[in-house]
Amino acid sequence: MPKLSPRDIKSKIAGIKNTMRITNAMKVVSAAKLRKAQEAIFKARPYSDKLYELMAHLFAHIDTYSHPLFKRRELKNVDLVIISADRGLAGAFNTNLFKKVDSYLKSCPSQRINLHIVGKKANQYYSKRSYHIVSSYQDVFKKEINFDIVKELGAKLISRYKEEETDHIVLFNNEMITKATYAPKERRFLPITYEDVHIQEPKLDHNTIYNIEGNETDILDGIISIYMNYQLYRAMLESNAAEHFARMVAMDNATRNASDLIKKWTLIFNKARQESITAELIDIVTAAEAMD
């Protein structure tokens, strides 16, 4: 590598400073978006609690086992719902999610796999592989989560399970584990089981009695549809928050690295300038001595 002049080094430092300003700005923006995403999760919690409570009561008081969404079948066709990001610059956010999905795919080599993808990154990754992509949604997280997309995907998944086009549906997304960590998660989406709801709502009052007015099947279909849509919506909320956290951390690390590089190149610059000054002094002294 050729030796850089002080001017070249100074230019390099200026470039790193510009990059640092960009990464720091992206960190600040991601932090603001993270707070907003966390607020959305918090606001959805009361609705979530009541919905799980209602589903738990349905299990306790209504014969749900004859409903097609509760029936288990031999696993011949498996659908995966993969919720990724539309953008990069978020550390291992997408990479770790894909590793978890790929690990699951290796565990079911004899099943026909169908993919439902949310996010550009998952679409780019899996469109290059031999899996069948049934549906793909992009720009879901541009501002607020587009609930029309949630309902469309939810209806499609429910229909596929009812029509026995798939025998099992698994949902993959990133979730915040604590305020400072996130991880990819895998959960069964369909069929629904008592354990799915009971884990969320353990303190069930079995004395509560529901009077069903109207067609029980229609009412059950409506409630289950709302419940399944909420599962998707909650997964997208969690993924959105985890993405902003991952990007905030990645940009913070990039800013710190840039700061370290500036310090390193500043030392190199000072050394190069000192060497240049020393060389000039030697030339002056040598020239003066030659004139004597």
UniProtKB/Swiss-Prot annotation:
Keyword match Ion transport: yes
Function: Produces ATP from ADP in the presence of a proton gradient across the membrane. The gamma chain is believed to be important in regulating ATPase activity and the flow of protons through the CF(0) complex.
Any one GO biological process: proton motive force-driven plasma membrane ATP synthesis
Protein localization: Cell inner membrane
Record's GO cellular component terms: plasma membrane; proton-transporting ATP synthase complex
Oligomer status and interactors: F-type ATPases have 2 components, CF(1) - the catalytic core - and CF(0) - the membrane proton channel. CF(1) has five subunits: alpha(3), beta(3), gamma(1), delta(1), epsilon(1). CF(0) has three main subunits: a, b and c.
Organism whose genome encodes this protein: Hydrogenobaculum sp. (strain Y04AAS1)
Membrane topology, record value: Peripheral membrane protein
The UniProt record lists the keyword Ion transport: yes
The name this protein goes by in its record: ATP synthase gamma chain
Major location (coarse): membrane
UniProt entry keywords in alphabetical sequence: ATP synthesis, Cell inner membrane, Cell membrane, CF(1), Hydrogen ion transport, Ion transport, Membrane, Transport
GO molecular function: ATP binding; proton-transporting ATP synthase activity, rotational mechanism
